[in-house]
Amino acid sequence: MRNEMHLQFSARSENESFARVTVAAFVAQLDPTTDELTEIKTVVSEAVTNAIIHGYNNDPNGIVSISVIIEDGVVHLTVRDEGVGIPDIEEARQPLFTTKPELERSGMGFTIMENFMDEVIVESEVNKGTTVYLKKAYCEKQTLCN
């Protein structure tokens, strides 16, 4: 069974919590544990915050797009911006790396995503934007997947 949702919103920090809760509510149909829901909310928060702060430099005119596809107990989550892009993806994925040290950002966003998800793919082009693909299987303990 396949189910999907798509969401677009202005790149405003106050929309991060809306995105987090919306995705968690959609994923709840898989009956994840409380810890698993917390993890998906954290991942959405990190990806959306990266888009707003780094992709759009806090320009509220930018648009963040989220797609979630659930198929056979697997969540496919995509977070996309059309911001400044990432010049060096490998460097950006290093723990503690940040382009905004003045904001006291921890530089752990991608590391957190990698720890909570089964797969994280980052595609980016300078001055065109960034897309983060995330995948998590909830099948192993779900009767829905049998």
UniProtKB/Swiss-Prot annotation:
One of its GO terms (biological process) is asexual sporulation. The keyword Mitochondrion does not apply. It catalyses: L-seryl-[protein] + ATP = O-phospho-L-seryl-[protein] + ADP + H(+); L-threonyl-[protein] + ATP = O-phospho-L-threonyl-[protein] + ADP + H(+). SUPFAM superfamilies: ATPase domain of HSP90 chaperone/DNA topoisomerase II/histidine kinase. Pfam families: HATPase_c_2 (PF13581). It is an enzyme of class 2 (transferase). GO terms for molecular function: ATP binding; protein serine kinase activity; protein serine/threonine kinase activity; sigma factor antagonist activity. Keywords: ATP-binding, Kinase, Nucleotide-binding, Serine/threonine-protein kinase, Sporulation, Transferase. Disulfide bonds: none annotated. InterPro entries: Anti-sigma-factor_SerPK (IPR050267), Anti-sigma_F (IPR010194), HATPase_C_sf (IPR036890). It comes from the Bacteria. Its EC number is 2.7.11.1. Belongs to the anti-sigma-factor family. Binds to sigma F and blocks its ability to form an RNA polymerase holoenzyme (E-sigma F). Phosphorylates SpoIIAA on a serine residue. This phosphorylation may enable SpoIIAA to act as an anti-anti-sigma factor that counteracts SpoIIAB and thus releases sigma F from inhibition. This is Anti-sigma F factor.
